[in-house]
């Protein structure tokens, strides 16, 4: 499984597909 650098989940949060998430303004 490859981790993506950033996926915008909306609601001010981004993450990858490896279980990590963080607050963000956009990707």
From Swiss-Prot:
Where does the protein end up? Secreted
- Tagged with keyword GTP-binding: no
User: How is the polypeptide modified once translated?
Assistant: O-glycosylated with 3-O-methyl-O-alpha-D-mannopyranosyl.
* Biological source species: Corynespora cassiicola
Q: Which GO terms describe its cellular component?
A: extracellular region
Q: Which UniProt keywords apply?
A: Disulfide bond, Glycoprotein, Pyrrolidone carboxylic acid, Secreted, Toxin
Q: Glycosylation: which residues? A: 2
Task: State the protein's purpose.
Answer: Toxin, essential for pathogenicity. Causes symptoms of Corynespora leaf fall disease (CLF) in rubber trees, including chlorosis, development of brown spots and necrosis. Alters leaf cell ultrastructure, causing plasmolysis in most cell types. In extreme cases the plasmolysis leads to disruption of the plasma membrane. Also affects chloroplast structure, causing lamellae distortion and reduced thylakoids stacking together. Causes accumulation of starch grains. Does not affect the nucleus or mitochondria.
- Predominant location of this chain? secreted
Its protein name is: Cassiicolin
């Amino acid at each position: 499984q490859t981790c993506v650098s950033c996926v915008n989940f909306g609601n001010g949060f981004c993450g990858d597909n490896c279980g990590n998430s963080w607050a963000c303004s956009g990707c």
